[in-house]
């Protein structure tokens, strides 16, 4: 039990410190559509007359001040401890299954899904659950999408193709299914309060005509290893959310990317670190930090 206690202790420490570091790096990187011109991108006028934000390609010029360097150093140190503890577990996949399920519940909850951890566990055990079937399916799809992505990573690097495949697993048979699961959007989407329009939205991502160029540059940066891994992962998460390439499911795919990149870059042997608990508890701050980058 001593080893288990140490594992959870380091996990909690790493969890909190890396979240703070990620948000700090995202915020310092570079202001969303209440936006004017920004150092992280430009406002373009679409052929239909609305304004949209097109992010610059990565990496940006970063300010390596003491706060960033200290946060990064501490996060790397704690993440290394978590990786070592995780590599010593006799059956990490069995131990991590409840955490993966919890991550799926909380990541989906950020997007409005109401299913609880207890309901998902009960449904997985074959019990009848009164919760909306769509909510249950969305969480179960998240787990399937993560499992699929991890399996593919053992054969192929992260790519636009793999991201589309993950999105297809995530959106299969649930709300948003008609929004072309597994395909990048061919129409404009936007972010804002219910009932808002393209002209009143808080944020409008790249128009369809600009989308594939943005995604091509994003894929190139996915394979760039010139930055410290945690900086790279934070920037990838931001850039994906700024591009918003799917009609639905972008937030969940973006958070899945964090876990997949941690494994792909060998920062963790398995997905031992789950950020959605922090993102859900600090949802307003999470979105604020993302908006502040653009």
Residue ranges of predicted features:
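FIC/Doc superfamily catalytic core
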Residues: 2-294
């Amino acid at each position: 039990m001593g080893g288990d206690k140490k594992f959870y202790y380091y996990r909690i420490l790493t969890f909190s410190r890396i979240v703070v570091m990620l948000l700090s790096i995202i915020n310092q990187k570079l202001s969303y559509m209440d936006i004017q011109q920004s150092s992280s991108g430009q406002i373009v006028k679409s052929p239909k007359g609305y304004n949209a934000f097109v992010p610059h390609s990565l990496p940006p010029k970063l300010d390596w001040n003491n706060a960033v360097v200290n946060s990064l150093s501490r996060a790397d140190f704690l993440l290394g401890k978590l990786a070592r503890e995780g590599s010593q577990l006799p059956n990490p996949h069995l131990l991590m299954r409840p955490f993966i399920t919890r991550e799926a519940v909380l990541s989906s909850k950020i997007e409005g899904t109401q299913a609880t951890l207890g309901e998902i566990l009960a449904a997985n055990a074959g019990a009848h659950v009164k919760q909306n079937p769509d909510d249950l399916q969305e969480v179960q799809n998240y787990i399937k999408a993560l499992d699929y992505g991890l399996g593919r990573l053992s054969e192929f690097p992260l790519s636009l193709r793999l991201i589309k495949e993950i999105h297809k697993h995530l959106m299969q048979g649930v709300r948003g299914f008609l929004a072309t699961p597994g395909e990048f959007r061919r129409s404009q989407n936007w972010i804002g309060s219910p009932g808002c329009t393209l002209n009143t939205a808080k944020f409008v991502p790249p128009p369809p005509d600009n989308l594939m160029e943005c995604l091509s540059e994003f894929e190139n940066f996915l394979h760039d290893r010139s930055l410290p891994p945690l900086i790279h992962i934070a920037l990838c998460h931001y850039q994906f959310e700024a591009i918003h390439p799917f009609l639905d499911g972008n937030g969940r795919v973006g958070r899945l990317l964090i876990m997949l990149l941690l494994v792909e870059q060998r920062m963790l042997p398995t997905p031992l670190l789950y950020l959605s608990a922090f993102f859900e508890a600090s949802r307003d701050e999470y979105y604020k930090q993302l908006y502040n980058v653009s």
